[in-house]
Amino acid sequence: MSKYFAESELIINEDGSCFHLHLRPEQLADKVILVGDPGRVSLVASHFEEKECEVESREFHAITGTYKGKRITVQSTGIGCDNIDIVVNELDALKNIDFKTRTEKPEHTTLTLVRIGTCGGLQLNCPAGTFVASQKSIGFDGLINFYAPVSYTHLRAHET
């Protein structure tokens, strides 16, 4: 039996969109680029061959379109892990919950999420404007404890 999500657990707007992002399930691609600043959504989407839809609500801005024939959504998260938590939960709900019946879909869809952003740096050999690709990240806010057990392999201390 599928899990049911009460109105208090999953707020769906009158137009069938999720509460914060204002996206409807059909507007979300399986591949999502996350950016912090809402202004960067248009910058990234300017590389799309075609724009299918654009939705804005507060600090959340999304554009879905195609790039090299692949359907992609660019979604802003705003600032902080609390906003990222809201965004990722609503993106997952859009793909894995039937908004008409408020139940889990029988087949789970795993989204591909790629975060593009900026950060400060402390290393002299890495001047401003340098492109950096992280393999891992570490958070000291404790949010990961709600999603993965402490023994999760990718979260273990990295020895240098």
Language model segments and positions:
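N-terminal short beta-loop-beta anion/metal-coordinating cradle
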Residues: 2-89, 100
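Extended interaction regions within the primary functional domain
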Residues: 10-14, 96, 149-151
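Single, functionally critical "micro-switch" positions that shape active/binding sites
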Residues: 36, 116, 157
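Juxtamembrane/interface motifs at transmembrane-helix termini
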Residues: 62-63, 93-94, 154
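Short, charged, surface-exposed secondary-structure boundary motifs
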Residues: 64, 142-149
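Hydrophobic alpha-helical segments and helix pairs
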Residues: 88-145
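Conserved small/polar residues in nucleotide/adenosyl-binding loops
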Residues: 153-160
